[in-house]
Every structure is written in C-alpha cells, then in structure tokens.
Amino acid sequence: MVSNLLKGLILFSLFISFLNGDDKIFPVTIRDLSPMTNPDFEIKNNNTLVKGIVKSKLNHSDRSPVYCCGDNHAPSNDAYNFVVHNQSTFHSWFHDVPGVNVPVLSKLVFKQNQTDPRVFYYETPSFFPIDDLGFKDPNYKGKKINEPNYMSKDKFAHNYHFCLEMHASFFYIGGEEFNFKGDDDVWVFINDDLVIDLGAPHTAESASVDLDKLGLIKGKSYNFDFFYCERHTTESYIHISTSIDLECKWKDYCGVCEGTGKCCDVSQCTGSLSPCGSWECPPPNIGTKEWKYNCIMKEPNCTLLDTMCTSYECNAISKTCEPRENVDPCAYTNSCEKKVCSEELGGCYEVEKKCYSEAFSDPTCYELPCVNGTCTVNRLCDIPDKCIISTCIEGNGCSHLKKQCSDKDYCTIDSCSSITGECFFDRVKDCQPCNETLCATDESNLCVRTECNPYDNSTCNEIKLVDCDDGNLCTNDICDPATGKCSNLPVVCEIKDACNKPQCDMVTGKCIVTDNCNDNNICSDDSCSLDGTCIHTKKNCDDGNKCTNDFCKVDIGCVHSNITCESSSVCMVASCDSNKGCIESPIVCPSSAFCLVAQCDVGYGGCNQYDKVCIPDDPHCQYGICDNSTKKCTFKDFDPLPFRCQSVAVKAGVIGGAAIAGVVVGGAVALGLALFGAKAGYNHWMSLKNNQMATSSVNPLYEPSPHQGTNPLWEAPPT
C-alpha cells in the first residue's frame, strides 16, 4: 500500500512539472482600425465562414496576403451582403495608412504544453490586446475619430476593430502541427502557401495543418506568416497551439519580427536628393530604427537607354527617362549630303546626295563634290591640252583624241602646241630627195600614208594621218580608210541583273559590274529583286554566343559587346553561359561556426546566420543539441518524457488507464489515478469533497487536450 507521504510527494512532483514550462514571446504588429476609417469593420454578415477572400499565394516581397478581387467586393455566403469592399479597403488591414489605422507593436506569449514539450499555445476567450491603445492612446497625435464605445455581452467596452500580423520562420524537422480556433478572419501561410483560410466575421471556427502533408524538406528553413483580424462585436476568442519551433531570426527597423520595413514612408526620408532622384526604403537589415536617414536615393541612369539614333535624359518632374527633343543624331559634316538614322541599319547613313544633275549623272565622266556647302561639277574628261579633243563616252569614260596636224610633206615635222592648239610644220634641214617609186603610197587610204625618210632616202616611213587612240582601254579604236575618220566604240559588257549595270574598267579595259544597289552602309546586305528594285536588309551579326549583344555600327561594322546579367534577388548570383545566356545560382553564404547555418534571405536583404537545427530520429521524443567543440549533434530525451515515448514496460504499468506515479501523462493528474482504474479512479477523485486542482480544467481526464498534448487517459486501456 502506498504511504500517504509517497502520495504527497508524487502529487507535488506532478504539479511542479506542469507549472515550470518555458514561454515563447513573439513580436506582432497590430493595426488599430475603426468603422469610422474603414467600412470593412462592423460590416454586416450572417456570422458564417467565407473562404477565398485572399489569394493562395502570399505576396513574398512584403509578406502580406493578396486580396482576391481587385476593385470588386469579396465573395460572400449572403446574396445581400459582402464582407470586404475592395482591395483599397483591404490594403489598410496589413499596411500602415496614416489616418486610417494606427500601428501598435505588441507581443504574444506562448506557453509550453507539459504533456508534449514541443507544443506551445496561446489562448484567451477575451482577446483585446489594444484596448485604450491606437486611436484611443492618449499619446496618439493624429486626427481623432469620433467612435462610439463597442460593448461586449457583459457590458464592457473593448476595441473590436484591429488586425494582427505575425511573422516567423522555422526549420522543418517532421511531425509538426498547427491548430487554430477563433474569430474573425484568420489566414496562415507556410512557405508562402495558404494553409488555413478562415475569412469574414464569424463565430469561432477551427482549422488544423499537418506539416508532414505539405511536402516540406527536413532541415530546410521555411517562412511562417499569421494574419488575424477582429472586425465585429461582440466576441473575440483565440486559441493557437503548435509544435512548430517558430523563431524570430531578425527584426526590421520597424521592430517587426522578420518584417519587410512596412513602416517606411518615403515622404519622410531625409537627405540630399538630386533633381531627378527619388527615395526608396532601405533594406530591412540596416539594424537601426532611424530608417528615414538611411533611405536609398534612386536616380535613373538614362544613358543606359541610349541607342544609335536616340539619346535619353531624365525628366525632373516625372523622374523618368525620356528621349531628348530636337536632337539630330546625324550631325552633318557635309551640308550637301542627307543622312538618316536607322537602329536596324546601324545608325546614320547617307540616303540621298543633294549634289545631283541629270546632265552630269555619268560617274565615269563627272564628279559632283560638295565644297564648302556648294555643289560643283568636275568634268573628268576635260584636260588643258589644246591638242587633245576630249569627249565622254557614256558609261565608258573619257575619250582623248589627238588633233591631226599633217601637211603631207615628208620634209616637215608636224606638231601641235598644247597651249594654243596651233599646228606647226618645221622643215627638216638637208632633207634628201625622195625616191617616189620606193615610197609609193595608197592615196585612197586616208588613215595611213607612206612617205620618204627625210634623213635617208633609201627607207620609207609609215605615217598615221589620223591617230584614233583615245587613251581609253574601254574603247575599240578604229580608223576608216575611206573617210579618215575615227570610231571609238565602247566595249560591250554583258548585263548581269536588272539593278547592276556592267561597265568597263578604264584602268584594265575589262568589264566589271558596278554595284548600283550598294548603299555604302556596311550594316546592310544589298541585293537586287527581279524587277530591278534594290533591297537593303539588316546585316546579321549573330556570333552564336548568347553572352554577347550583337549589333552593327555604320562606322565599325559588327560589334559584339558582353551582356550584363542581373540577378533577380539579393540571394541569387547571375552569370552568363554562352549556350544558355543569363543563368542564376543561389548565393553561397559562409558560416562562422559549425553550429551556425548561413542562409540568404530575400526579406532580410542578404546573408544571415542562424542556430543549426539538429534533427533527431524521433522529434516527438527527443531534441538535438549542437556542439561547436566536437562539431557534432547530440540528442536527448525530453524531460519529462511524453507518454507516447515511454517504454513498453512503463506503458504496461498503467493499470486500468492510470499512470505510474511520477510520469507526466496529462495536465491534470491526481494521486488517486495511481490507485484506481481510469474512469473509476477519476470518478472517485472527483467525488472527494473539495479535492480539486487549479490546473485540472486545463486538461481534464476525459476531454481531448486543447493544447495538442496527447492524453493517454482519454480511454482506459484494454484489459
């Protein structure tokens, strides 16, 4: 038989073990609202649950829920009413809006469940955390609102109009759960996914999440975001219990756990601002509450937008980059030419010559240069020699024929003055008599005659009466003996296509094709259509490397500049792959110790270090401890050990559903449970006059634990 002393020691041990639990304190942001500032509060509703008010994905950038329906009402179960007006009214639930809400930094204190040390809970049937705060705070300096008192059922005035947000994170180890019961709106996001959706003013509703069913990876960190709104009288009940090991890894400059700097108002930023600059809120990790002195000035670099044909400048009013007005990208170096700019064809190029004349359009005979802004004509066939007769042969250049000076006297030397063009016939001294028989000539040939040699009458000279050589290799020079006239016939070149006329090269005498479609732009590929139309297409500068920007400039040709790959977030490193282009990889954050895990967090603004989580094989029964000195994880049993973790021998010792003395099996354990069977023992204990524990209501023997602890005495074990 157990002695009375032993009974007392057992009872005392159980009582102390229940009361010595640890608390967890979580910072929360509560925004005081009012029906006077937001019509979504005290809105008519039939006290029923409405799902779908928020979208299934959290806005990751500021960790806020996204309203479902834009400028439309939220869905409702009541055809005559709605529960949210629009995205504008919803915005002030979880964002600071001066005059509409008042942010209040507060905290929730979670108690540890003694049945299961992993579980922490928060519960109150009267959840009014900001009574006499917010708009009613004596220190509130904003515009006062004329709000009536809203009374509870027991005729006490409370603040029934507020929204709360709590942010944390956790390393998933397995077996975690989250349970909620309460009113009104509640949304829970894990890893940015909506896992609990209890929308609209309603009576207390329950929801649970088994994290093992969410596809999470053990040892990986995940965000946890909790949103709660009280929007209607006359109750405010909340109960939360969870085995998720939530932690606040950092606080932003607003004092919010894992916040995104929502309290920042760029209109309050202080500093030197350039004419085209604008303020941006600082990253959450600046480590100071003086955010207004740490704002980041953003100024657009408009030169990055410049193209070959357009330059940009910043508009100081709109603070955006705009094209410069009245700026001609094609500055004329020659006022006789017209240029246009084409992004596709590589910049400025000549499209039209102002110096043009139909009479002087043959480029083989004429040039039309622009000199000091004036068009001039250069006649290529004109030479100063008066003894040369020059003409233009269209398409074949210049013909230069010598003036014929002949007196048909073999005793004279015939010449021409290049200055005056006058013929001279100088007599040869001691000219020898001519042997007419020897040097007889054909008088009918007017191109060539045979004359005696004035210096040697035993020989004759063949004299050209007409010199038809015009000095142009692109003509066939022929003298007609009957008439003595020259024919300088152009070389005939075969036509290749409808655009490009062939012509003879005066230097070589050979036919060449002059590219009439050549626009003198190295950034265009020129071709000719069947109908004789010139076609100019953009030159293909693609080098096959996806890490280069390939383009053409009229003064250079193809250019291949390296592209700049920008990362999508502070936690990604951008690089370039010649086959794939820009790619990203996660940034590697260095850790300073074995028991610290370095991770990059976008919300934090970069790398941060957290305590390493050691994952036991059975998280329900053990917890891990990291040792920097040994660089190992060790695991220890929870003390007291939850009933589900007890050995078979201990569990077998539970007689009739009672627990062996000294083993914590529930929040309310009486000594009589060790002496009597489960139900019989409990009934006997309850029948004892005035024998009640203050904690017995927390976890009664025959009711499930509201704090997620397993009650092994819920049913008597089979006999």
Swiss-Prot record:
Bilayer-spanning residue ranges: 654-674
Lineage summary: Eukaryota, Amoebozoa, Evosea, Eumycetozoa, Dictyostelia
Side Extracellular, residues: 22-653
Membrane topology per record: Single-pass type I membrane protein
Alphabetic keyword roster: Glycoprotein, Membrane, Signal, Transmembrane, Transmembrane helix
SMART domains reported for this sequence: PA14
Domain of life: Eukaryota
Descriptive protein name: Protein psiJ
Gene name of the encoded protein: psiJ
InterPro entries reported in the protein's UniProt record: Fibro_Slime (IPR011874), PA14/GLEYA (IPR037524), PA14_dom (IPR011658), Prespore-cell_inducing_factor (IPR051154), S_mold_repeat (IPR001673)
GO CC annotation terms, alphabetical: extracellular region; membrane
Sequence ranges on the Cytoplasmic membrane side: 675-719
Major localization listed first in the record, in broad terms: membrane
Glycan-modified residues: N46, N59, N86, N113, N301, N372, N435, N457, N562, N628
Ranges of residues in domain PA14: 112-260
Signal peptide: 1-21
Compartment list: Membrane
Protein family according to the UniProt entry: Belongs to the prespore-cell-inducing factor family.
Pfam annotation, one family: PA14
PROSITE patterns: PA14
